[in-house]
Structure formats: structure tokens, C-alpha cells
UniProtKB/Swiss-Prot annotation:
Pfam family name, one: NQR2_RnfD_RnfE
Name the record gives this protein: Ion-translocating oxidoreductase complex subunit D
Xref: InterPro entries: NqrB/RnfD (IPR004338), RnfD_bac (IPR011303)
Modified residues (FMN phosphoryl threonine): 185
Organism of origin: Yersinia pestis
Subunit structure: The complex is composed of six subunits: RnfA, RnfB, RnfC, RnfD, RnfE and RnfG.
Keywords associated with the record: Cell inner membrane, Cell membrane, Electron transport, Flavoprotein, FMN, Membrane, Phosphoprotein, Translocase, Transmembrane, Transmembrane helix, Transport
Amino acid sequence: MQIASSPFTHNQRSTRRIMLLVILACIPGIIAQTYFFGYGSLIQVMLAMITALLAEGAVLQLRKQPVMARLQDNSALLTALLLGISLPPLAPWWMIVLGTLFAIVIAKQLYGGLGQNPFNPAMVGYVVLLISFPVQMTSWLPPLPLQGTSVGFYDSLLTIFTGYTHSGENIHQLQVGYDGISQATPLDTFKTSLRSQPADQILQQPIFGGVLAGLGWQWVNTGFLVGGLLLLWRKAIHWHIPVSFLLALGGCAAVSWMIAPQSFASPMLHLFSGATMLGAFFIATDPVSASTTPRGRLIFGALIGILVWLIRVYGGYPDSVAFAVLLANITVPLIDHYTQPRVYGHKSGHK
């Protein structure tokens, strides 16, 4: 009789498979983003992925780690994907290269690689770019229905690498919509316009012509929501973080909107604009930098939702998912310390 050695149960969900599933779940949101904002997002993702693989491979070589085995876990590709779709589609090529290098080399490998980083690498790269180059990082094109000039793949490629389309237009000219007015994202438009207009007048602007929220952005968020639900269905992520994130953000927005509807954005605008769904299902749920206990995940997600609302309303940036996630990452050791489940046979309590 042959006796097998342990382990006697096996989990087929390897890191490589989970990372690949998360990448595939991003596809609905990427399709929507490409349709409404052009091919630039796809180009940014490809540049980020190439940079991430080269950077991670070089660092692993320097650390004398097995290069191919580490690269095949798909974690570098996922970091690159999240950063690539977070940047404006026509941002200069050197920005995505710089941000990806910072995310992989500094925010991930400097801490020891996958499983050791205390902060979400993609969001570290994003915040570094946002603080360093705020103008370029807020230069989003108008959504397709409002575009004054259609930007195809070739023009997107030219603009990313040279700054101009084949007809000589730069990013600032491309931002001008069909009505001759320079466009911004719904959250940015709402936040800026509140200084001089009440909310009901702001919502008459064409950018807010969507069924749920801003034109284009509502479908991008819906796409990432669909992908996030797929991850929940496949049990690739826990439900605690996205649910508590969205409930906290929606709750804060609902209370403020009911108290002063002329001064605050509606819950739907908060939930279906910016990077809300991407953040809730794909960024905040990073298993390395997020809380690891069930109660801790609820607290962690709710904290991010509250921070997103606070920074959007009172901070200097119209969208704030990256800042909120990184700030919440700082609290993870404390949250995990006080939310560890009691071990059977031991009394609860902390010394």
C-alpha cells in the first residue's frame, strides 16, 4: 500500500490564475473606456506592460531571483494594466514609463517583491505622476458624443509619442468639445463649477447627459462593475471590501445630497463617475496591501469609501481613489491587529 504525503487537499487557484482572471475581468471596462475615449488607453496599457516586464525582469536579475518564474505570476502585468487605464489616454509616453518604473521598482521590488509591498504599487505610481505632473494627468478627452475631433488609433499613437496628431492638433485642442468649450471629467466639472453655480445648473451641462452619471464615465464604471461581479462570482475576491466601500461612499453622498442638494453631488454621480468601480473591485481588493480579516476588510473598505467622499468634496483633487487607498493601506496593520478572530480555546483580548 502506498501512502501519500501531505497536503491531501489542493487549491487550483494559483497566484498566476487569479491575476489572469482579474486581468480578464477588466476587459468590459477597458472596452467601454476605449469606445468613449479612444485607443489611447490600449496604447498606454501596452507601454505599461512592456515597461513592467522589462523593469521587473531587470530587478529580479539583480536580486538573483528566478526571472521567468516570477514574471509568469502575472502580477507585473496586472499592476501595469491598472496604471495604464488610470492615466488619460493621450498622456505622453514617458509618463506611463516613469509611473510604471516607480510602481514596479520602488513600490513593489524595493520591499521584497510580490507579497511584501505595504502599498498598492499601481496607485503609488499613479499618485507620483499626479503630484508631479497635474496638468497632464487631468487632460482627459471629452467622451465620444461630445468630441469635436475624432481621434483614431494612428492619431492617438502620434499624440502619445509626439504631442500632435497628423493634422497638427495638440492635446489641449483635442479637449475642446463640439460646442467649442474645453471639456473636463464630470467630477472635475462639478467640483470646479460649484464655485459659481448651484448644482441644478451644473447638471444641465452636456457632460452630465448620461442616464446614471456623466456621459461615457457611467458606462466605463458599469463595465468595471460587471467585471467586479464576475470576480465575486468566481470567488477571486472577497465581497467585504467592495460592498463596504460602495456603501460608505454612497451613504456619505446620499446624506450630504439630501441635506444640501445644491452644494453636493448625488450618490449616482459619485458611484458611476471617476474610478469608483475600478477602485472598489480591482484596486482596493489587492490581497497584499488590504486587510486580511473579515471584519478588517469591512472597516478597510468603509474607510476608503469615506476618504474618497471627503477628498472629492473638500480636497484639491476631483477624484481621490488612489489617495484613499494609499491612506487606508497605512492603517492595515492596526486594523488587522484589532480584528483578528479569536483562536478557539483562547480568550479574546490584546496586551
